[in-house]
Amino acid sequence: MRYSTISSKYVNALLMVGKKVNKIEDYGELLKALCDVYVQFKDFFDNPAVKVWKKVETIKESFGTSIDKVFVNFVSLVFENKRQKFIPQIAAYYRYASIDVENKILVNVTTAEKLSSEELRAISEFVKKCVNRVPVIEEKIDESLIAGAVIEFSGKMIDVSVSGRLNKIAREVFSLRKG
């Protein structure tokens, strides 16, 4: 529990500032990149012998001009408070929290094969009509679906896959045999 509380405080602070300076999406990308750099060089960043300023300078150098003063201060704060081990969770939580702050909705779409841009647009329009929010689609591939899709959003699951229909038919057949 403490783990998510720590992450959420950093996320909420960065979201608040990001909203004021209109950089919510930019900070999300920077956090994702920071997470990648942290995971790759974890031993360096977790080494207590390396000074905080050196860690922050290393990040600034690796990001180049894409990093602004606000984000540098955020990173400095994370390292000064020795919270760098939470960077992956901060990045993950920020992604979901930023979707909510921007009045969007996360939509998980699982299909047997990659969807075309036209199919994605159709799903996006359908979800937008249902919940009146801009969808952020997260695609997953599951070949066991055979064909069709499973769409999950706002606590709802719409299964229009072949395997889903076959499972439904099987349940109905077995319920008839029992009765």
UniProtKB/Swiss-Prot annotation:
Signal peptide: none annotated. It is found in: Cell inner membrane. InterPro entries: ATP_synth_OSCP/delta_N_sf, ATPase_OSCP/dsu. One of its GO terms (molecular function) is proton-transporting ATP synthase activity, rotational mechanism. Keywords: ATP synthesis, Cell inner membrane, Cell membrane, CF(1), Hydrogen ion transport, Ion transport, Membrane, Transport. It is a peripheral membrane protein. One of its GO terms (cellular component) is plasma membrane. SUPFAM superfamilies: N-terminal domain of the delta subunit of the F1F0-ATP synthase (SSF47928). F(1)F(0) ATP synthase produces ATP from ADP in the presence of a proton or sodium gradient. F-type ATPases consist of two structural domains, F(1) containing the extramembraneous catalytic core and F(0) containing the membrane proton channel, linked together by a central stalk and a peripheral stalk. During catalysis, ATP synthesis in the catalytic domain of F(1) is coupled via a rotary mechanism of the central stalk subunits to proton translocation. NCBIfam families: ATP_synt_delta (TIGR01145), PRK13441.1 (NF009976). This is ATP synthase subunit delta. It comes from Thermosipho melanesiensis (strain DSM 12029 / CIP 104789 / BI429). The lineage of its organism: Bacteria, Thermotogati, Thermotogota, Thermotogae, Thermotogales.
